[in-house]
């Protein structure tokens, strides 16, 4: 026994012509016995290139370049290395085997067979065999050679040497003596090499005929050529003889490329196909034997019997045989995967160990054993004769047959071989086939047909000579007999005229194509014409005497491919351009009624791809330019690291450019490969469909097959490779009365095999009971269909960066690019944390695998280590599924690095029946919840940042859900209703407005909103006459109101105007919506500007669709002969037309609650909310929701959506003094006197309503960076005072009190895309696959429309990412958490985490952080900055030289924006205004005025000294540690001081329309008092002025608000210019002469030259200064009277009329005091206050103290007994000022009672 391993040789073929033309790179290299496979460049990325793979084999044959003689291995070298060794072993008596393995086209047949000039391994071995026999044969040694030739196709064995063998399959049996064998296989005796050559040639012809008749691809069949060598040894002396029998098996395996595709073989086997079962099993056998040889599984089962091939090769694989394997590979880079698979296959095969023994004298032993077995069987049979055992009888017949074969003499074998050969020749002659050795070597004067076949071994093998009159058909009487699909008994006739002309005349209903064109009449043939008969019989005609005419040659050279050489075609019979592929492609192109439909597809895709690529690269370039510009501006020279600032910029830009270039190259290569694949698939699909339709039609199966297009499931995932074509052909299967099925190309391939077998049995009229495939079901249509992919839902995992749960209804995107329902999922982080960046341990050798991960904060310190992260995935339910696929719906997904897919099964309730309505949408409930523990690596972080969890949703068709007619739409449930369409492009937002007034506690409180039936604005605001007011505006989205990713980022401006008075009796009220009052006048306040625009766009789209449908219906109706497809198409068009009419009605009269914009409201709004919902139309691009222009300023959305009575009205911009941190809300100061409207200055009459319009401009960050103008009409009632009765009633009333009114806006981004599509996606895919070139009304073909639509899947995924990111951000804002950055991306903004940085922000960073910090936290540094206002949109930014500055204006941003936390990487698209779209949109803002008059900053210095105490000593200002952050260093302090100086010295921009207003310079208030040298006995340290982060803006309303007191112009009496100047001068002089102290006079600007009247002057002089005191004031704490305010100070304060309150604390209390603005109150005002507080306890009454007698001492004593808690919350308090005209009353008595609710100090002269 000889134990030897299988010898394995690898041979690499030369590049073929296609690879040379494509300049494909060679990836295979051979050195000695090593083969090196390099990864192709297109499959690798820079920095992660795969290492080359090295394999070692017994032999490596380099056959790439014949010119390299030292390395080149030709056919002779291959034979010497493999053939000679095999032959030697055969002569020694061992069994031997050579099998060739490799993909189709890798050179297997060439290596095994070769051709005439270069013979292959088999001919050389046979030739050497007979040469050696002739040398060694003598008297004592004789040789006998027998051959058999069989083919294994689809697990069936056919005898290629038996004329009848090609029509019937043979059975494989296994005998305990002989082992596996083929029952009935011809074993013919040969005596010479010529006999073998002849038999192989005739066997190949039989193989070709059979394959052509059945349209089988020979590359999928295995050919086994067996040579049995029998040596008989005679001992001349003793007369004994012995035999050695060896069998040499030469196996040409099928193409292996299909096995290399992962999962493909398994899928096909599941579908019941046997195409590659033999190869798959062969791989398993080789693996099992290799494991056995390696000692891994000694008892491992080897599945020999799983396929016919491995069963027959059992001895050759791991048994009694010397085996060699030759693996053929391609050197091209585009065959890398197939080559790698082949090399791995061969690498495992070389480990197999065989146990070969010499088969010496087997015959005698075998015959003896067989005879003993026969006797034994006869005995058993006789004993069991009564039982009539059929098994024993069959076994007996089998053994007797074997004995008979073994005892046949050599002479009888030769005679039998001769008989079979003659019968085979007669059969070929009857079919018209030439019996020449080589079919192409015929006489020059003969006309003949030569076959074309995809297999080079079978191509041009059959030659049919033409007579003068040749008949072609399936009947036995025809000259050329053809069998197969589409061949009629009498198919056509070919006639040769006397002058040499050859013509072809087809018969009726007989398909004949010449050069790809279907011919129906007599057609002249020329030399080289390609002829197709039936479905798959391709021939080329050779007419040596009839060359093409010169003019025809020239014409073809001009129009045809340039490489066609017709002269060569006429002289050489094997013209490469006229091969099988050329002829097949030619037929497909012509049959599809198009010059080149596939080329159309390719051209459209290429065109769109190039446009996308160009725009993407341009956008990339602009983005890098913007980033570089930002870096230059933000990293100013004094702040850059001195080491490598510019170098880093240059390096990063260079690296970025390299990445962009590499990305473009990879994408181009991927796109090119995808185009080639799509072309191949389309050709293949059309070929298969044509054959399937032939078979179905001939067998009357009433089934129709059509090629359609669909998106591959892999491309519906957001993780797919960009650049690949997102479309593939699919097969739509339709049968009358049944539902439509969609098959893949592979599935149809598998079904076709069964169809052919069934067709063959049907043709041979095999009885139904014996039909093999009748038991396996109908291959034409699946009665029990497998599951179908409904769609893929992509869940983006950015929520794992934040500790927030993502609850979202993810759209399920179908393979037509439509939403086929929604999957409700939850994704959350259970445990663990996401690090900002992954830090690798340098000490570890393999840190990336060690799992040592650290969470690093922004300062670089390690917080804690984390290794694991637990994620939870929940699938709740699927809604809106198409009914026809809603039977047993399940989900399947793979999370991150999980090896196996997770399946989520539905919750099945047997009591709930399935809906049977055709248009119903189905809901499936799941209870799936699973936790995943993953290692947090850089790859995982990149995955959750950029990738998605792709959940596939599968379903089965509902039983009985069929239709009685052909259907496309009728079974396709309409899941996209109008509500669904509009829901994706709409979102509602609410705008709430409340008005605040000063209350008795000095706080701004919301005024009441009274409901009234005649007012539909939400209510009437009750405003006190003459009070200071504020307007608070809040904008927030409405949850579950649509899926448009809308996010309001900030309120930019608030303006108010359009004051209108309406009588409740005579006129109808003004509202913010449409009213259908029958008794009103024609006045209508509802704006329909945007709604009309929406309806107009919608109507235009419907009109286009209607015109298209009319045209199509007319076209189909005018056809005289309508096919079934035409009838179906007409019914479908009419159905669409009816649906279009319904949609048209929905445009004009939408049903209430239908979700269509403009639909009547059918809801009960909350109190204060308007009932009807106005529409705002953004008019964005439907593909990516981008704006065509910058929607800012005068171009902002909603600017022109004016309300009635608004046009021409005057609006006043209100200075915004505060933004909310928790929501999008802004508070603006409102002085109603600027309107100069009598309706706002007087008390409103009983039957009158005052209406105003509040106009708010908000900044949207999503769906696009833009500005949006919102309007709300409000109603107001001005009253003077509440009576005691009214006050009492209000306090004891149980009614709910409302304080705000609102309006809900419906924001529409664009018209739904589905509305604009002329055909539904499924029909469009069919029309595109048919390649109908007729254009639509817009000039686009169907294929262009379909590909354009399919390529937008990427846009769908991008929008979905945006929607989910908005959902995450809304969830975060609900939790009121800061969004932190979770990835280590460069953060040039956050240069320092310990100080504010104003220099690093652009113009668009207008100070709208997501969560603003309180200004008071840093008031020590910013208290002298009066306010951080915002600049107007069009204000110029100028530097010191006067030119426009590129750096952002200092006042445009809150100084603490640098402290707002940076968002994670995935939130970049969420902040287009702040991050991505800088320098594009200017936020609207208002400036500070008269800043040049502001004094230098003083109070910001912690060391600032103010007068304190009675002794005149100074003490430093101490700041409250709870409300501020201390400055860490002098450097920061100096920097902030410089910033303050810059802020104060900036020149503001004054809008022209506000230039005439008076200016109140609040910056002077409380400034000069700080430096006063007056000895104030009760004074204490003044508290800092700035206590919040207000954004007080400009003088736009005619006045200026102070930052600390929040007082406005209305807080003081504003005299006219002359008098005020005189008054100011007088008071200044008086103060300076008495105390030499700067007064508190405000610097008024003269508004006019009008002087005060005497009455007004008197009023000013008689006004009363009342100062509210705080809880911790001196009076409240009971300070001794000795520390009271000197009377001279009181006089001074009274004269100036501009005093600030003094909040004096005991010196032991370190809490800083707080300054207050003066409040001037008339007697009337005081009386109102007293009436409002009727329930309080009055002080001083019981003690009999009067107002005049209230001294300083008593006042202090009084305050010590009756003190009030401070309810201002540490904030400054101010109140409104009465109009000067109201100051007409004087004190009527000297005694005024002071209520407990507010203590007052009367300061008068």
From Swiss-Prot:
Tissues expressing this chain: Widely expressed, with highest levels in heart, brain and skeletal muscle.
Biased composition (Low complexity): 1612-1621
Residue runs in coiled coils: 359-436, 602-775, 1100-1138, 1518-1547
Biased composition (Polar residues): 1385-1396, 1751-1771
Predominant cellular place of this UniProt entry's protein: cytoplasm
Domain Kinesin motor residue range list: 5-352
Binding positions (ATP): 102-109
GO cellular component, one term: Golgi membrane
Intracellular or extracellular location(s): Cytoplasm, Cytoskeleton, Microtubule organizing center, Centrosome; Midbody; Endosome membrane; Golgi apparatus membrane
Span of domain FHA: 469-519
Keywords, sorted A to Z: ATP-binding, Cell cycle, Cell division, Coiled coil, Cytoplasm, Cytoskeleton, Endosome, Golgi apparatus, Membrane, Microtubule, Motor protein, Nucleotide-binding, Phosphoprotein, Protein transport, Transport
GO BP annotation list: cell division; endosome to lysosome transport; Golgi to plasma membrane protein transport; intracellular protein transport; melanosome organization; microtubule-based movement; plus-end-directed vesicle transport along microtubule; regulation of cytokinesis
Phosphoserine sites (modified residues): 636, 1287, 1454, 1490, 1529, 1572, 1648, 1698
UniProt-listed InterPro entries: FHA_dom, Kinesin-like, Kinesin-like_KIF1-typ, Kinesin_assoc, Kinesin_motor_CS, Kinesin_motor_dom, Kinesin_motor_dom_sf, P-loop_NTPase
Gene Ontology MF, one: microtubule binding
Biased composition (Basic and acidic residues): 556-567, 1519-1528
Ranges that cross the membrane: none
Region (Disordered): 556-575, 633-656, 1385-1404, 1507-1531, 1612-1645, 1749-1779
Stored Pfam families: DUF3694, FHA, KIF1B, Kinesin, Kinesin_assoc
Family the entry assigns: Belongs to the TRAFAC class myosin-kinesin ATPase superfamily. Kinesin family.
Protein task: Plus end-directed microtubule-dependent motor protein involved in intracellular transport and regulating various processes such as mannose-6-phosphate receptor (M6PR) transport to the plasma membrane, endosomal sorting during melanosome biogenesis and cytokinesis. Mediates the transport of M6PR-containing vesicles from trans-Golgi network to the plasma membrane via direct interaction with the AP-1 complex.
Subunit-level organization: Interacts with AP2B1. Interacts with ZFYVE26. Interacts with AP1G1 and AP1G2.
Protein name: Kinesin-like protein KIF13A
Gene expressing this chain: KIF13A
